Amino acid sequence: PRVLIDVMTELIKPQLGDKCFDPACGTFGFMIAANRYVNAHNDMYALSDRQADFQQNKAFNGVELVHETHRLALMNAYLHNMNANITLGDSLAQSAKGLKDFDVILTNPPFGTKKGGERATRDDISFQTSNKQLNFLQVIYRSLKADGKARCAVVLPDNVLFAAGDGASVRRELMNFCNLHTILRLPTGIFYAQGVKTNVLFFTRGTTEQDNTTEVAFYDMRTNMDSFGKTRQLRKSDFDEFVAGYEDPSKRTGERWSRFTREEIAKNPDDSLDLGLIRDDSIVDYDDLPDPVESGEEAIANLEEAVDLLKSVVRELRALTEEK
């Protein structure tokens, strides 16, 4: 939703002269929000010719894989008076290897596996997995400028926080390369299909590639929250408590805020970051759920029974009509 894009952008605070990037840009929404933020916080008429040229032609960049969506991104940028660099291609492919040294990355990578399980072809990431989000995460933190200031906000599903194997390796590398300082646990059903659980990871690239994360703050916007959807849409005011604590750690009061040191995280199996959720006894444990195959077959049987019943009703109505 637009409100989440705006909140992420306002917390990352893109500045004049920042080179911004979205490696899975869709229709370019994040970069348009970044451009809007820069314009709102600066006197654009006071820029030098060099500054104006950079903002117009070099500041905002993106990559989009789908041809039709790429065309929409170009059109969207044009309508917002942005001569942006939007590449038609795959950020996980070798051809995108040169897209590096960005000051700001704002993105929402697609879910799923890479081409039905094919691994990323870039040779500059450490762990080439079939998990698209883990590959994108590696591309993202390796695409940030290693100056201690380059920063990112990225939407990722829960599995990135706890996946074993390469998932654990990617999390360790992320926390080594970057200061992963904040994780926002989002409500279900606001960004994707109902039931998909997502998070926003906020991190800053370090100047080194070792021990940059010392502590991670978590904010639980998921447990005991309203059910968001068509009848109750997400509002900017829903983020007020999170934004206040993000910008001023002294305001991180209340049960929704928690923090864990790197040493505490290391004690979790696979360096899991699946932390920071308030205990909610109303939530059913996954282990207690019925077998999904059996549940699916039962649902099919119930639907077939309902269809048969509906058919019989139609037959009876037709017979009554014919009698008249």
Which role fits each region the language model picked out?
Residues 1-107, 112-114, 123, 130, ...:
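Conserved S-adenosyl-L-methionine
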Residues 99-324:
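A conserved structural/catalytic subdomain of Rossmann-like adenosyl-cofactor enzymes
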